[in-house]
């Protein structure tokens, strides 16, 4: 039997049948190399496939520079500087995010059509603690999400380079239920800080060491949904670290925020993402059925005014709702 038919709800690069799939799914040697890296390590490095990349990178840096007070950050700032969804104002950001060759590549790697839903642009290092995107952006079926980090300039070792933990993507996707948490008790998402002690202990348990991506301008790193990654400390604030991250979802899924969800309690913090390539809001689906968000309910937006219900009543209500 075709392995694709056995597990259609698992990304091809995450499939336990990867070795049987590889040659047929990716006849191109370079694409097969990228797939193998993602399967083994949870990330893959590529040269961004854009002929005019240098000019586009310069345009992004020039247009976004005025939005940041980098001098003040150098004197007083902690953490990082960022702008989210600059694709709405700047075509160059949108062009990189929705690049047809990237979309085709990701679609071939995952086995479903990819589309971009969020961009983040940084002039300096993020200095962000190690985390997985899966607690922020998840899907059902799980793992149909990835990120593409792009170097908009050569990255210096003291500029707070991207860090990642190879192989961490193979860990289970831990959520509120495994941590003994109920988001409803907190009135919404709790923040990734509640997960960070677990991630630190898992790193020690598995003996993993952080690797740094000393990228040159035009290189990109694809990471899978559950890869542990973050930003190293920026040791020299004289350096910039211009970069762009685009987050991607895939067709035929439901998309939600696990940190703010208690699915078995009837609370799912669904996302209503916009496809950057088309500008259209994408609808959540489950096994081909569109999920009506007004029926399922957005977590916490109605919780404050909703009468308290038992766990059984919540689950029973969900079981008898129509999702088509």
Role assignments for model-derived ranges:
Residues 124, 165-173, 247-253:
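Short edge-strand/loop segments of extracellular domains
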Residues 121, 132-134, 150-154, 166:
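Short, structured patches in soluble enzyme cores that scaffold and shape functional sites
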Residues 18-19, 158-228:
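Double-stranded beta-helix
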Residues 112, 124-127, 155-157, 220, ...:
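Short, charged/polar surface micro-motifs in flexible loops or helix N-caps
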Residues 133-145, 208-209, 215, 239-241:
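A short beta-loop-beta micro-motif enriched in histidine and acidic residues
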